[in-house]
Amino acid sequence: MTFILAATLTLNAPEFSQAHLGIGYLEWLTNSIFVAAVVSLGVLLLARGATRQMSLVPSGSQNLFEALVEGLYDMLEGIVGKHMVQKSFALLATLFIFILVSNWFALLPGVGSIGWGEKTSFFNTDVEVPLLRPSTADLNMTLAMAVFFMFMWLVWTLQEVGIKGFLEHMFGVKGGVKGLIGFLLVPIFFFVGLIEVISILFRPVSLSLRLFGNVFAGENLLTTMITIGKQLGFPEWVAALASITVPIPFYFLELLIGLLQALVFTLLCAVYLQLSTAHDEEDH
């Protein structure tokens, strides 16, 4: 197996396998962790550059970042409320921006097409282990984000309603029913509470698998479109031309899907938070 550069312009062989790039104390550094660090550093540098010389009348990159932040804030405030958005906005906005940039970073030429593999011909290369792997196409990364959010969800929920309020919300009789009827409904609502506990435990799994599955499926879709000429048995020069032109419409589709998946992940997190922290007497 040799280190090779794929001739195609994009992803060529998405893999579950990880490439460990570090040695010694950096042995834990994988291709997806490296990409996550690059994306995080890039976002920080862009944000720093946009806010270095801020003015009352924004322009250029400052205007773009302010529009993004204000739009996210207004959207999340409409879901979690004025009080909770002050606590949760930093995390939810960070998740949205990181997932969005990571999804779009995966579409850059060289991500997934440079790595270790075997060269089959001048135009076709089988990359078995890519040097750069999209972080959101790594289940470890998506699961880590989901688990960390659920931890903060539990912290914020207990801060808002307390342990007693949390248990009442999970297992208590709903609708203000009291007396004999309320007593008879206790076993039913306790069973419903157990089902709710199970659903909460599966939330990080569903969040992580949904994001991972869509991003990974997008990689495979682009791979199929790139290699379709070869798979159909076209001449090598036709297959090479098809590998460049056929995937173009799907690039725009993946740009849209990358945005939608970032929105879905963030909005689901906001909805989970709103459901557990909303007070009936408050206006949300």
What are the roles of these predicted feature ranges?
Residues M1-H284:
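Selective transmembrane helix interface/packing segments
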